[in-house]
Amino acid sequence: MAGLLVCAACLAPGLSYGQVTPPAKPDLGPNVLIFDPSMPAAQIQEQIDKVYAIQQHSEFGAARYALVFLPGKYQVDVPVGFYTQVLGLGATPDAVEIDGNVHSDASLPHNNATCTFWRAAEGFSVKPTGGTMQWAVSQAVPFRRMHVRGNMVLHQSRGWASGGWMSDTLVDGNVGSGTQQQWIARNSEWGSWTGANWNMVFVGDPSTPQGEWPSPPYTKVDHTPIVREKPFLQVDASGRWSVQMPLLSKDSKGVTWHDGSTPGEGILLSTFYIARPGVDTAGSINAQLAKGRNLLFTPGIYELDDAIRVTRRNTVVLGLGFATLRPTHGTTAMITADREGIKIAGLLFDAGPVSSPALLEVGAGPAGSKARMAQNPISLHDVFFRVGGAGVGRARVNLLIHSAYTIVDHTWIWRADHGAGVGWDSNTSDNGLVVNGDHVTIYGLFVEHHQQFQVLWSGNYGRTYFYQSEIPYDPPDQASYSNAKGVNGWASYKVADTVTNHEGWGLGIYSVFLSPGVNLTRAIEVPRGPGIRFHHMITVALGDKGAISHVIDDQGEPTSIQPRVTPKVAEFP
């Protein structure tokens, strides 16, 4: 791989990371804890433990944190709780070495990690105590640019887990997925992989495990057709902070940093506007964007009385510590223009009490150049959406994409099934994702519990690599959950009848109906045509009420609990 391309002012020649002195630290607010190797390990550990005491059980709490490690070696134990992002700030993961456990533990009794959401580990290496790293997680848990110097398990003592995401990661030993229901690994490497359950998808991974779908349920895509890795913070050997923007890559395989830094370019952090919760408003943020500034959200919740508008090409918007945008007056939280190269990363969009037409709208207004978009697409990375759970929230659509060639690299779009403000008539949401643009590519699409189509895809040449969806638990009766006469419910994944070209790999759709007599006719609904192709689909009933009658259109038998039937369709058509 070529070395990382950065602006000349970002690097000082002739210095190695072994010569790093503690750099001047930017003011990123009280909830970004910055550690350097000169600090006593006990002092670092004390701060980590204080954060975990706050965040361990704070599923719907208001606090947000980023734990930031500057290049060097550390001997600490890092438990990762809710809304906590652990970051290494080296040019490669190996520039930050943690000798000790970095772990995510199950948040429910009986080792159950199915509600272990909203936490992240990015950009460092870990040598786990005892040789094995435990990462028991479910949705909205980025694991990026990591090097595990040992083994890794994706569960806690074989308790249930519903993940998950891994990208640009090297695990020297074995990855044991165990009781994970599903997983996507993109551009990652390991010594070996063991385990499978319902839907395991591997894209651009050089050493995929042996076996073929459906037993084990492995979906293997040899190369990643097009992707841009997520922007990330970096501190160079002179102590300068920058945001690195990896280059667009095509037909890639394996991690980006084998031969040095991830290829890309850097922008000095000093040129970013640093937003602060409780201080900044939509108005103050928009004023800075209008001046041509890029934007860094520090951890916290931002109450917005208007939409944040990203209109300039190549704008970077990066959130730390699950920075959360919540519209308060029924507006869209963020709207981008149809301009090439916009990058949105690391944000949680949380619906407010007044229904929003969308939470994030991509490509609004006059159409831009499709030729330029093809060469420099808009990309979304680790963008998460929530309707309800922390309180009443309402949105018609969560993520609305108009721009052609948009890349989505990991998203969870969740209408809450538990927490505060939850009910069929309380946290209302028609659709999780609506795609109108052509040539949109999505890796790691998790969409759950919305009240009509979870996904409605109207653009042509769409591609989805991994889809996980639970349809809504809580329709009170079939009449409240019917798309058309003679059709029960709304398909989870709907490709519009006008579409002529669409393809999906590795789709799992599950039901947990709480009321008797509620069913879904088909999990996936698509038009017929030579350009419509799907690979490796499964439906599962997780509760004893209702059923999914077909997997895709009229193919696939009904789900059943007794006897257990998990219908699968290998190829469509």
Task: Give the positions of each predicted feature.
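Bacterial N-terminal signal peptides
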Residues: 2-13
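Extracellular/periplasmic carbohydrate-active domains that bind, remodel
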Residues: 18-573
